[in-house]
Curated annotation (Swiss-Prot):
Residues 60-73, 295-310, 847-866 have a biased composition (Low complexity). Belongs to the formin-like family. Class-I subfamily. It comes from Oryza sativa subsp. japonica (Rice). It is found in: Membrane. GO terms for biological process: actin cytoskeleton organization; actin nucleation. Residues 34-76, 113-149, 161-223, 250-404, 451-474, 677-702, 834-906 are annotated as: Disordered. InterPro entries: FH2_Formin (IPR015425), FH2_Formin_sf (IPR042201), Formin-like_plant (IPR027643). It comes from the Eukaryota. One of its GO terms (cellular component) is cytoskeleton. Pfam families: FH2. The gene is FH16. This is Formin-like protein 16. The keyword Secreted does not apply. Residues 463-474, 677-697 have a biased composition (Polar residues). Residues 114-128 have a biased composition (Gly residues).
């Protein structure tokens, strides 16, 4: 409700100005009046005078007129001076009266607006009257001036004025929530109430703005904004109450120093600060009344309780901007409060989570703290002052006799009451999570364990079971006729099948092969003994009560005669083709491996080199002069090292064979070298220099050339013996017994078909049995042939090896496979050695002859020593004749070696 408009002093000011200004003029027109100015100084102007020229000093009275009459010009000037002085005096007096009336009206306006004048009206009015106004407000404050915590500052001013005698004035019965005021409500109210068509003079407004001091920094949140009011009076349910957080400071702060945040900037008198209240003893005071608009009278008592424990500090300084106040330390959390103090509350000790209310009193339960705790009054505080929940969460409230006994959970308990700091368990409440005790009793109760063991013990003689006293539902129990573990395994197999029971029965009755091999293999694992079949067939109860495994087996036995024999027959038919193909492949591998060992001449040369080297090393001993040796000695060649340890007997033998093969290849294929030599002889015409040049490289270079040519040939031996390596991996027992196994299974299937006569299953398998019988007969003949070839090959390399019962029948292939691997590694080592020896050397200069060294090396050869030639001609000839070979990998083939050598020759 807007305050009643006060009478404006404007008409009175105009009337007074007219009377004071016109009266002297009217009196001065009829007579010559001597004007005397008052000796006192005029009061200071609130605004600068419009005329800047100095006026005559009013302090000195004018002289009395002389006896002689003045001139006309002197009279006119005296009259003008008198008029001007009178006008200025009138304006000064009128202005002073105007400002007095305006100040009085403003003070009255602010007082009627809700007591706001007690703050800044006392500061300004005190400068004029020298005392604080004591005028009572006619109606409650509008709520447009709040402190930094969102509380009504005018309410606290009124509370201070009441003193220690009582609880203060009662708040109004109903208080409308504050609406968002305009940006400058004070200036708007002044213009509306005073009915001023024009704003006050700019100099006076500017002065007031300069003298005032903003209470909050510019750009910060306006406490009178709509967002602040909504959060103050309508807090959200999920967040901590704004009253419980912000009012803890407001109720504990002295009323003389509220941090007021007004809607508009409030002027304050800088020379006369607000009087600080006298220090009051920290005596208990009655509970504080609730500000207008609050819901529960118990909340202020619970919030201001933490401020009583500490003594009242000295009076604080005049109010400063709210942003500059440092945050005080937080109070002890949830400390039980003593009786509320009397008198105004002391300064705020802390800013943080509010403590819980005192445990005594008829007030409703306090608001929950930030942790979200709920429950009754807290127990006596521990040493640290932190309250703990009265009971552990999850503990049932019933008696021990009514609770079911559960399995124990072994853990170490923690005494949260003995800690002096907050813990995570403080945030756990009894109502945040509800435990379903029925489920936990069913899962972990001892009665549930006993119920699981009773069905096996309660079987009767007929295979059924009783459910009396078990506490189970009315659903029929499953009957287990087999061993429980076997029944469980069969149930797992049945659940993994991808076909239904009817399809399985149809395939077993008609001999269809639509069932996959995987399904047939799983069905073959369901085979049970005769005793178990008799137990299932003797069951005369309801089949629907049987367990899944027993039910399936009983249906299978009743619908299909000899079901597991039929499953084995169908499985044999499904696997027959793959097993026969694998057997044929193994026989073919053994046959080709035997042929490779009989026809490859390079392997013979390796054996010859080993034999000669062994005889040379064993000369003069009983092991010397041997004609043959057991092939098991090939594995020991790498163990015989040279005297200096730089090489082994294996490397020596392989290097000799490589050099021999390279020399043979050089003689047979190096036609370009011979052609170039013959052309050189014909061109030189018998010149000894030319004939010496045609002799080619030295002995060492030729040996290296032979090694480079022979390495691809010897290294490709592993590729030529590929089937020998495969034959070493063949399972000889499988090859020998596979035909017999297939024959026995085929004979059992044939006998089964004869038993069934002419039913669908027999008709479906009769054609397969006939074709398989013929194929197995042919396979047996081929098997005998291949095994005989393997024996002859073994005897070919080692006489009497087949008669050794402890020897492996395929031992020859295994030894050769291992030796070929050693040969490949030796070839790689030789190639690496050649690459290390072949290092680029700078060509000799023309001034230093290098021919004698080359001639000396050439003389060591069997060929006659050629005549010496100039170094330039020898080097050019070597570059033209010397072939180049690429670096070979670890495993190289003969075809690649041939292509490399031919490309080098070209």
């Amino acid at each position: 409700m807007a305050p009643a408009p006060s009478p404006t002093p404007l008409p009175l000011f105009l009337l007074l100005l007219l009377l004071v200004g016109v009266a002297p003029l009217a009196a001065a027109q009829g007579q010559n009046i001597q004007t005397r100015f008052p000796s006192t100084r005029t009061p200071a102007f609130a605004t600068p005078p419009p005329i800047t020229s100095p006026s005559p000093s009013p302090g000195t009275p004018t002289a009395t007129p002389s006896s002689s009459p003045p001139s006309s010009s002197g009279k006119r000037s005296d009259i003008a001076v008198a008029v001007v002085s009178t006008a200025l005096s009138s304006f000064a007096v009128s202005g002073l009266a105007f400002f007095l009336f305006l100040r009085h009206g403003k003070k009255r306006e602010l007082t009627e607006a809700g007591g706001a004048g007690q703050h800044y009206g006392g500061a300004q009015g005190g400068a004029l009257t020298g005392k604080r106004p004591e005028r009572e407000p006619k109606r409650p404050a509008r709520g447009n001036m709040v402190d930094e915590n969102g509380l009504d500052a005018i309410y606290w001013r009124e509370f201070e004025k009441e003193g220690d005698g009582g609880r203060g004035r009662k708040p109004p019965a109903s208080r409308r929530p504050p609406q968002p005021p305009p940006p400058r409500p004070y200036r708007a109210e002044r213009r509306q109430d005073a009915h001023e068509s024009s704003a006050p003079s700019p100099p006076r407004s500017r002065k007031n703005r300069i003298d005032q001091e903003p209470l909050i920094p510019r750009g910060s949140l306006d406490s009178a904004s709509a967002e602040f009011d909504e959060s103050l009076y309508a807090p959200s349910a999920g967040s901590t109450s704004s009253f419980s957080v912000a009012a803890a400071e407001a109720y504990a702060r002295p009323p003389s120093t509220p941090a007021i945040t007004a809607v508009s900037s409030v002027p304050r008198s800088s020379p006369s600060p607000a009087p600080a209240p006298a220090a009051r003893p920290a005596s208990p005071s009655p509970s504080l009344p609730l500000p207008p608009g609050r819901e529960s009278p118990s909340r202020p008592q619970s919030i201001a309780a933490a401020a009583v424990a500490s003594p009242a500090p000295p009076p604080p300084p005049p109010p400063k901007p709210a942003a500059a106040a440092p945050p005080p330390p937080p109070p002890p959390k949830a400390a039980p409060p003593p009786p509320p103090p009397k008198g105004p509350p002391p300064p705020p000790p802390a800013k943080g989570p509010p403590p819980p209310p005192p445990p005594k009193g008829p007030s409703p339960p306090p608001p929950p703290p930030p942790g979200g705790k709920k429950g009754g009054p807290p127990p006596p505080p521990p040493k640290g002052g932190a309250s703990r929940p009265p009971a552990a969460p999850g503990v049932p409230t019933g008696s021990a006799d009514q609770q079911a006994k559960l399995k124990p959970l072994h853990w170490d308990k923690v005494n949260v009451a003995a800690t002096d700091h907050s813990m995570v368990w403080d945030n756990i409440t009894g109502g945040s999570f509800n435990l379903d005790e029925g489920i936990i009793e069913a899962l972990f109760g001892t009665a549930a364990v006993n119920r699981k063991t009773k069905p096996a013990d309660s079987k009767d003689a007929s295979g059924g079971s009783t459910s009396a006293g078990l506490g189970r539902s009315n659903s029929p129990e499953q009957i287990f006729l087999l061993e429980p573990r076997k029944s469980h395994n069969i149930s797992i197999i049945l659940r993994s099948l991808t076909v239904g029971r009817e399809e399985i029965i149809d395939a077993l009755l008609n001999g269809h092969t639509e069932l996959s091999t995987e399904v047939l293999e799983k069905l073959s694992r369901l085979n049970i003994s005769k005793e178990e079949e008799n137990t299932l067939l003797k069951f005369s109860g309801n089949p629907d009560r049987l367990a899944p495994a027993e039910f399936f087996l009983l249906r299978l036995l009743l619908d299909v005669p000899s079901p597991f024999a039929r499953v084995n027959a169908l499985l044999f038919k499904a696997n027959y083709a793959a097993e026969v193909a694998q057997l044929k492949q193994s026989l073919r591998t053994l046959e080709m491996a035997s042929q490779e060992l009989r026809t490859k001449g390079l392997f013979f040369k390796l054996l010859e080199a080993v034999l000669k080297a062994g005889n040379r090393m064993n000369a003069g001993t009983a092991r010397g002069n041997a004609q043959a040796f057991n092939l098991t000695a090939l594995r020991k060649l790498s163990d015989v090292k040279s005297t200096d340890g730089s090489t082994t007997l294996l490397h020596f033998v392989i290097e000799e064979v490589v050099r021999s093969e390279g020399k043979r290849l050089a003689i047979n294929r190096n036609y370009s070298l011979r052609r170039s030599g013959s052309l050189a002889k014909s061109t030189d015409g018998g010149n000894p220099a030319a004939s010496s040049t045609s002799q080619g490289p030295s002995r060492e270079e030729r040996q290296n050339e032979y090694l480079n040519l022979g390495l691809p040939i010897v290294g490709g031996l592993s590729t030529e013996f590929a089937n020998v390596k495969k034959a070493a991996l063949v399972d000889y027992d499988t090859v020998v017994n596979e035909c017999a196994i297939l024959g026995n299974r085929l004979a059992g299937t044939k006998k089964l078909l004869e038993t069934y006569g002419d039913d669908g299953f027999a008709r479906g398998l009769r054609g397969f049995v006939k074709a398989a019988e013929q194929e197995l007969n042919e396979l047996k003949g081929n098997q005998e042939k291949v095994l005989e070839l393997v024996q002859r090959t073994t005897e070919y390399y080692h006489t009497g090896a087949t008669k050794d019962k402890n020897a492996h029948p395929l031992q020859l292939f295994i030894i050769v496979r291992d030796f070929l691997g050693m040969v490949d590694q030796a070839c790689v080592d030789i190639k690496r050695k050649l690459q290390q020896q072949k290092k680029p050397t700078p060509p000799p200069s023309s001034s230093q002859p290098a021919a004698p060294a080359a001639t000396t090396k050439g003389a060591a050869d069997d060929a006659p020593a050629p005549a010496q030639k100039p170094p330039e001609e020898v080097d050019s000839k070597r570059k033209r004749v010397m072939p180049r070979f690429p670096n070979l990998p670890a495993h190289f083939m003969k075809d690649n070696a041939d292509s490399d050598s031919s490309s080098d020759e070209e």
